[in-house]
C-alpha cells in the first residue's frame, strides 16, 4: 500500500486537476490519496475536499491552523508507518500507470530511497532540458507524452544528487532510518527535500530518476521577492549543513547523465509527426540559447570573481603595509618608553641628590 500525500492550501483549479488526475489513473499498486488541508482559506477548496472525503475517494487531514508545507507533509507521512509514500504537489498532474512505474523503480534496488520522475518544471529533472519552465512541451498532451517516456526509457533509472520534491517517492525503510523532513530549519518549504536526500545519502540510500515517467508541474507563475528571499535563506542553511551540495549538483549538470534519455524521447516525438518534430527542433534551439545565456552568466560571475580577487589582493597588500607600520610604531613606542624610563630615572636621581644637599 502506498500513500499519495497531497498538501493543499490555495489554488482551487490546480488542486482539482491534480486530484482528478490521480483518481483517473489506473494502477496495479494499491494506494490511498491522503490530502492534508493546511487550513486553506479558499472555501471552494474546502467544499471540494469535503465532497471527496464523503464519497470515500480521499483520506482528509485538516490542520487547525496553517502549519506550512513541511509540517503538513510530515503529518501525512506519519499516518501509516508501514507504507511507502509519494509526495505530490497540488499543482501537478499525472497520467497512465505513473505510480506503478515509480514503485517499480523504487523497488528495483534495495538501496534506492527516493525516486523522482521527469517533468516540465523540475530543475535538474526537467524535460526537454534542465532549466525549462515553459509549460507542457509540444502538442501531444500529458497522457501521450508520458506514454512516450514509458516506451522510450522502460525501467531505466539514473542516480541523482538529490530528489525533487514536486513528486517524490520515498521508501518507508529510508524514511524510518533518516527521519522526517526538518521543519525547524526548512519550515517554509524550500530545501527540505534536498536536505532529506542528502541525509539519506549519508546513510547509504540513493536518490534516482525514473526515466520512464513524466509528470506535469505547473510551478510558481512568478518568482516573488519573498520567495527569492526564502530560497536564499534555505540555500544558505542547506550549504551550512551540506557544504558539498552545490558542487555535486554542478558536476551532475555538466555530466548530463539524463541527456540520452531526453534524446530518446525527442526521437520518439520527432517520429510522431511533422508538427511535433517542429516543436522538438524549436526546443533544441531554445536549449542552445539557454546554454549560451548560462555561459554568459558564468563568464560574468568569473569576471566578478577575478575583480573580487584583485580587490582582496589589493586589500591584503594594504593590510601588510598597515601591519608593518603598526609594528614600526610599536617598536618606536617601546624605544620611546625605554628612553622615558631612563629620563625619569635620571631626574629621580638628580632630585634625590638635590634633596640630600638641601637637608645638609
Annotate each language-model stretch with its function:
Residues 2-14, 18, 25-26, 36, ...:
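A conserved hydrophobic helix/loop-capping motif in glycosyltransferases and polysaccharide synthases
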Residues 63-80, 96:
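Glycine-rich, basic loop-to-helix element that forms the pyrophosphate-binding segment
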Residues 23-62:
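Acidic donor-binding segment of Leloir-type glycosyltransferases
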Residues 70, 121, 134-173:
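A recurrent flexible, glycine/aromatic-enriched loop bordering the glycosyltransferase active site
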Residues 85:
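Short aromatic/hydrophobic "clamp" motif used to bind/position activated sugar donors
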Residues 244, 251-360:
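Boundary detector for helix-to-coil junctions that initiate low-complexity/charged tails
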Residues 97-103, 159-179, 184-216:
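A short, conserved alpha-helix in the catalytic core of glycosyltransferases
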Residues 93-134:
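Conserved donor NDP-sugar-binding/catalytic core segment of glycosyltransferases
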